[in-house]
Amino acid sequence: MTWAKVAHNAGNGTDHVDCDSCNAYTGDTACTTALPVLCYKSDGSPVPAGLTPDFYNGWQPGHISLTLPVQGTLLTSLAAANQICVNSFGTGYGIASFSHSLGGWSWWSYGDVSSSQRFWTYISSTSGNCWN
């Protein structure tokens, strides 16, 4: 399953990442496609002033980054996907999830990732991952 960056708030350094017409149930991109992995590291960051999280636009308290593009076929499990993030950014990073503490589909976090292409994410409740 892939997501996209839909907004950046330069005032507080946050990105809004979103399903943006993804298929959360069966995936939306051929696993032979090479795309960056959206990686996330939780650090307990408070919600920035002016941002009001809700079910569809949550807050992930941490930072996001993108790996170099990898074929989805390398995402053979959640552990394999997490390891790609660790190898790229260090301990504590893992592949970003569809869900957040209030719900899913879309969330904000600190970062400024590229908006030029979609990126791999994962979902725990359906078969939308390349390893399913």
Where in this protein do the model-derived segments appear?
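Secreted/extracellular ectodomain signature
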Residues: 1-132
